[in-house]
Amino acid sequence: MAPRLVLASQSPRRRELLAQLGLALEIRPADTDERVLPGEPPRDYVLRVAREKARAVPGDLVLAADTAVVLGGEVLGKPRDADDARRMLRALSGTRHEVLTAVCVRRNASALGVELDAVVATEVAFARLGDAEIDWYVGTGEPLDKAGAYAIQGSGGAFVEEVRGSVSNVVGLPLAETAALLRRAGFPLPWERP
C-alpha cells in the first residue's frame, strides 16, 4: 500500500491541482519563515523555502512547494496590503516576468530517507494596466493572498497575454514535474496502481 501523501501547504490552489491527479491528501501546513534572505537569488529562495516546508512537517511522504513571481530579479511575494498589491500590479503592467515554483518531495521510507526537488520557471506576459483596472482588481480581494498579486486562474487571467511554460506552475504547482518527483520517490500515481 502506498504511503499517505501529506501536503505541507494551506494553499487551496495546490490542493485543487493535486486533486486533478486523483490524489488523496492529508493537509498539514508548514510553519516556516518565507522572507527572502539578503542577496538570495530567486531560484535559491523558492528552493530553500520548499525544502524547509517539507522538512518541517512529519510524514512518510511529504510534498511542499513555494511559488514566487520574479520581475527584474526582484521576488514579488504575497502583497502586505491593498497598496502593496497596487504597487506590484503597476510594476507588472506591460512586462514579461517569471514565475518560479520549487517542489520538494521528502520520503522517510528508509533509514536515510529521500529528498527530491525541482524548480520550474514559466514566463508570463502581462497586459498594460491602467489605474481603473488595477483599482477594480484589488477591490475584488483576489490579489491579496497571491504571489505577485494576481491569480491566472481567476479574474487576473484577463491581464495575462501570453504564457510560455507550465500554466499550472503559475497557479502554484507544476503538475507534470510534481508527478515525476512523486514517481521518483516511489509513490505510484492513481493510474499506475493495481
From Swiss-Prot:
Its main location: cytoplasm. The record marks 13, 67, 153 as: Important for substrate specificity. One of its GO terms (cellular component) is cytoplasm. The active site is at residue 66. It catalyses: dTTP + H2O = dTMP + diphosphate + H(+); UTP + H2O = UMP + diphosphate + H(+). It holds the Pfam family Maf. One of its GO terms (biological process) is nucleotide metabolic process. Its EC number is 3.6.1.9. It is an enzyme of class 3 (hydrolase). Its cofactor is a divalent metal cation. Coiled coil: none annotated. It comes from the Bacteria. Keywords: Cytoplasm, Hydrolase, Nucleotide metabolism. GO terms for molecular function: dTTP diphosphatase activity; UTP diphosphatase activity. It is found in: Cytoplasm. The keyword Hydrolase applies. Nucleoside triphosphate pyrophosphatase that hydrolyzes dTTP and UTP. May have a dual role in cell division arrest and in preventing the incorporation of modified nucleotides into cellular nucleic acids. Belongs to the Maf family. YhdE subfamily. PANTHER family: BIFUNCTIONAL DTTP/UTP PYROPHOSPHATASE/METHYLTRANSFERASE PROTEIN-RELATED, BIFUNCTIONAL DTTP_UTP PYROPHOSPHATASE_METHYLTRANSFERASE PROTEIN-RELATED. HAMAP family: Maf. This is dTTP/UTP pyrophosphatase. It comes from Anaeromyxobacter dehalogenans (strain 2CP-1 / ATCC BAA-258). The lineage of its organism: Bacteria, Pseudomonadati, Myxococcota, Myxococcia, Myxococcales.
